[in-house]
């Protein structure tokens, strides 16, 4: 049903998205009549815009007679209507120069490429250099008591990665350090030989909650502890560039929102959005309850870290970002980062 728009409606939706992206002003039917590929009467365009609004692809701006894209409209545009801007090819030479800096290790090349992507798009950029989440299995979860109220939990993977989490029972009288040791043993048996991505799903499942139901007073803390550890594994190769670019946006001109956004980055929660995607993907803030931004989106794409592992690069910006420009730059960068394997 989503793909059953008439050709005329598709052209109008595409025009609204791209016009709004460029001018950041609600789009009216009269404005669209000046476009060379929309040779229709203003009344015809206006009628179709009303229909697109009723179907949820456009929405009315209360301060103007024009319309702006809805999240549904953006999704349809990205899946069916996007055309790449070939003029961005002039920027590819600067990407090639970064990729060809053989004196840098791969991690440094990724950082340099990320800084360049930030400069080319003017948006916050980030990368995960290795998809540890999908390629590393848990070999052991160990419990080390420090005293009667404190302990350390170690999570070890088959790739030799280790994360530790401190745990305190000082304010929990319903469970002892010995009970906790038993719980961790149960978790170890449950997650051993599981990929970190599988383990993350298990930890958040109803099945897991039932398994440790006996210790319900400590359930939420335990789940949060393991999820933080899993995110920490992935963040070992996490890079950011241009965070200040997001803080310059008018929507973030609020101390409370800035605090939430910085906390989002510090807690590595954006990792959960980027992981487990095997192609160019996008997430809008209406489906991202963890982001404090109203009109935010994350556009990400995988690249080969080595023949067996994938990383991801991403752009974090407003929903009205210039997709015809940003996407081909992102795709070109991903392809050429993947080619680093051929040079080793």
UniProtKB/Swiss-Prot annotation:
Disulphide connectivity of cysteines: none
GO MF term set: DNA binding
Job description of the protein: Negative regulator of class I heat shock genes (grpE-dnaK-dnaJ and groELS operons). Prevents heat-shock induction of these operons.
Sequence similarity: Belongs to the HrcA family.
SUPFAM superfamilies: GAF domain-like, Winged helix' DNA-binding domain
Record protein name field: Heat-inducible transcription repressor HrcA
InterPro entries with a match to the protein in the record: GAF-like_dom_sf, HrcA, HrcA_C, WH-like_DNA-bd_sf, WH_DNA-bd_sf, WHTH_transcript_rep_HrcA_IDD
Protein's organism: Aster yellows witches'-broom phytoplasma (strain AYWB)
Presence of the UniProt keyword Repressor in the record: yes
Annotated gene: hrcA
Example of a GO biological process term: negative regulation of DNA-templated transcription
Pfam families for this protein: HrcA (PF01628)
Taxonomy, superkingdom: Bacteria
UniProt entry tagged with the keyword Nucleus: no
Keywords: Repressor, Stress response, Transcription, Transcription regulation
